[in-house]
Amino acid sequence: MSEPLPAPLPAPVVAAGTPISVPLEKGKEYWYCACGRSADQPFCDGSHEGSGFTPIAFVAERTGKALLCRCKQTGSPPFCDGTHARVPPERVGTSYRVDERDAGDRGAMPTPRATPEEPDLELIHELAEHGLEAVGSEGPVGAMGVPRSLLPHWDDLQILTAQLARRPLEADVPVGTELVIGPRAARPLRLEIPLLVSDMSFGALSEEAKRALATGAERAGTGICSGEGGMLPEEQAANHRYLYELAPAMFGYREELLPRVQAFHFKAGQAAKTGVGSQLPGVKVSARIAAIRGIPEGQPARSPAAFQDLRTPADFRRFGERVKELTGGIPVGFKLSAQHIEADLDFALAAGADYLILDGRGGGTGGAPLLFRDHIAVPTIAALARARAHLDRRGATGQVTLIITGGLRTPADCVKALALGADGIALANAAIQAIGCVGSRICHTDRCPAGVATQDPVLRRRLDVERASLRLQRFLGATVALMQVLARACGHSQLRDLNRNDLASWHRDLAELAGIAWSGAAPPPRTLG
């Protein structure tokens, strides 16, 4: 069955009946409001969330004033082309679209507009007109992960609860929630719950967001991962279950930091942009971030695609053994995205991994080339099922901790992930939403309206650290409590006892992806009569 075509965009709001002259700086990137809702016209402030619109990125070609469109009818955004003259004054502040038959010179070439039938039309025209000059060497960039509508749905996995063949547990029966990361390590990391805050760097997130996440996780009895931007001292001090991530750029890494961490992992990749490295825009590299990362202020922070001096399992094993020597034996693991899953897991196991953080398609980031975000990686549901099956085959189950991440949001999602074989779940998007993120998907612009993914001091002041940390604590506590409700209904007194027998799906393809039972009745064999 073919997928339904996406609905056409609604008409934008006419923000004003005239253009506005604004100063631009050559080489600087700006984000133009396309929806008309922004209070910071003509630039985006995140108000497009839920509108179906996305802001338009452009780089100023020269320093000076430019006349930018506010009527949202221009055929050459962000610049005014005179179309505002055709907008009735009474339509200011309302949704409106000029009839394209009257929108410009009848003798001129028409303006390309993407349609449900040809959704890539504008990209093709952009590449044909400008090459990579405007969009950058890796193509257009977007924030967060693949839209959820393009992924297998956790909601299409059904939980099978107990009744006769297995009895459910009463509401007063305790349900264990502990997660031990790296049980074979000399100093395994013990969390009170199987949820933790995933890797998000200081730089991608504000200091206030990092402190709120660390404090909220600590209050909930769980840990936080550092992200690849180095150790923010205030974050580390706020949480005594701190998992340090070392990425190929090795930002700010020094051995003297190791006694302050409780687990350590190498970053091999992340679902939204594995194989291409990463970059924090220079506008986000404040003096504090530059000092922690050991890089120049105001310059882009680039991380290579792979470690330069660590290539073989033996190389990583030697590095990991040094980490253990300096820390008394904390767990050492890998964060990897779901690509060549079995081969990459074998590499990590050969390198001595105590734990694995597997990021499936659906996992997000502050900014990734859409060429990668929208076209790489195995979806989280299938990736998790394959990883657990492979660890079972290798005899690593119970020895190497498997933590899944990438698109999980709700208590039901987390229960299903545990049943599919995850030992723990690392939450990124859900965690930042709990502290205030409203899903504007403009993290890479430094204009986050909630103060979460920005270094702008005015926007950062919107995030109250204490209030945000309490929100995360409540979210994690409520999520685990609801997970316990479902575990009792399935007859389990430990969350870790959830298994594939607790799941089925009426989507046959999804059942095969997940390695679980199909809910339907298989047809009887055909006979010849």
Residue map of PLM features:
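Conserved, well-structured core domains of diverse proteins
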Residues: 101-195, 199-215, 222-223, 230-231, ...
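Gly/Ser/Thr/Ala-enriched C-terminal appendages of enzymes
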Residues: 409-414, 418-518, 522-523
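Glycine-rich phosphate/ribose-binding loops and adjacent secondary-structure elements
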Residues: 304-460
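Glycine-enriched alpha-helix->loop->beta-strand junction motifs that scaffold or abut catalytic
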Residues: 221, 239-242, 260-263, 350-355, ...
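Active-site beta-loop-alpha junctions enriched in small/polar residues
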Residues: 200-202, 229-231, 247-249, 269-271, ...
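Cysteine-centered iron-sulfur cluster-binding motifs in ferredoxin-type domains/subunits
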Residues: 30-42, 66-77, 356, 408, ...
